[in-house]
Amino acid sequence: RSQQESLGVVGVNLIYGAFYQHDRPRKMLRYLFDHIDKSAIEIDTINFTGPLFEDVDNRILSLELVKNGMTEAVMFGPDGNNLLPARVLYKKNILAIRGSFRPVTNVNMDMFTSSSSLFYQDEDVEEDNTMNIFEITLSNLRSNGTGFIDEQDFMDRAKLLCAMGLTVMISNFKEYYRL
């Protein structure tokens, strides 16, 4: 199938979802890929706004995108709003710290401080053109012993990192080099 056809199907599914599934945003997300293969298109970010979605936290829906294999990674900024990774990372120096951040510890922050000071010593790296990312993988989110993701635990970590003024990435990258 061509990319145009796939986008057309996603568009029709989105319109259908807006009319008939607006009260169930998670279900609406899954319906976006009805009648197309997940490898045909990737949804990098999603943002539900408006009076019908006041109780929806877009960070949870971003997590759903990664969990359902619709994208490999999602990001949100210190304000808790979703970010489009391609837009915010384009032509940036990237310093990524991977961890579970359950909770954020002094060791995590010391690693970040030490690595950033080393990173900025490179003459090609400009601090104001650098994006610092705290990455949590799906594996880290599932490491609670049950194999399932505890959404309240995820939200607690996300809120803590955002309150610290940090940019958060949730990814399905098992290997660090893929990040």
How would you label these PLM feature ranges?
Residues 1-179:
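Nucleotidyltransferase catalytic core that binds NTPs
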